[in-house]
Amino acid sequence: MISTRAHGFQRLFTGMMGLLITLTAAASKPAPLPPEQADGWSLRQEVDNVRIYTMEREGSSFEAFKAVAELDVPIENLMAVMINPESCKEWVHNCIESYAFGQGSFQERYAYSVNDMPWPVTDRDYVLRIQTQGDATTGEIIMTLNAMPDMRAEFNSRVRVDRSDTHYRFIPEGERTRMVWVQHTEPNGALPGWLVNSLIVDIPVKSMQALEAVAKHNRYQNHRLQWGDDGQLQGVAPAGR
């Protein structure tokens, strides 16, 4: 009985952390994310090819995290995954529903997603604005994700999360890609900061490892980046198009 109960609590806490990491929403006046190269980052853990750093944030009980990984896939594969509005279910831990909505473009588009929570915690949903930009000179691609919680009606069976900032940067290194993921979240509900901060490592590690594996699937092979005359990224398409 003790073992079963402990397992239940572990799954509950892991589910809560999945919410904090994958739900990417912005407050009306969010504090800016700490820069990637800020002095305050402290290495928290290194798991295989993923390194997790954390940093305390002034006025917040919750730490920011930075995850850095050397992924053994080319940037074209990764971007083919990232532009798929349903790919959240493939690589983001605990994401069970995801789809695009609205009249978006490659540079600015919208998605709705649901994060599975273990009973008795209610599933969380979120509405995202996803902005993507790339520079042909460096080959780097940056994605920022912020919530627009009022763009879609809420469901009684789900709780909408409305505060977080996320930044992805993809740096091509030949047939490999360096990925940097920075996030700071102020979660809804009465979750103590000490608990969240103690579990902040697990979810980004699992998600980035899954992303590397998913990007090797056949459906994400043989894509190319489409650059405009101004050197800005315009889209991602199969190589034959």
Q: Which residues make up each language-model segment?
A:
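Bacterial N-terminal signal peptides that target proteins for export
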Residues: 2-16
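Bacterial N-terminal signal peptides
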Residues: 14-24
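Eukaryotic helix-grip
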Residues: 28-241
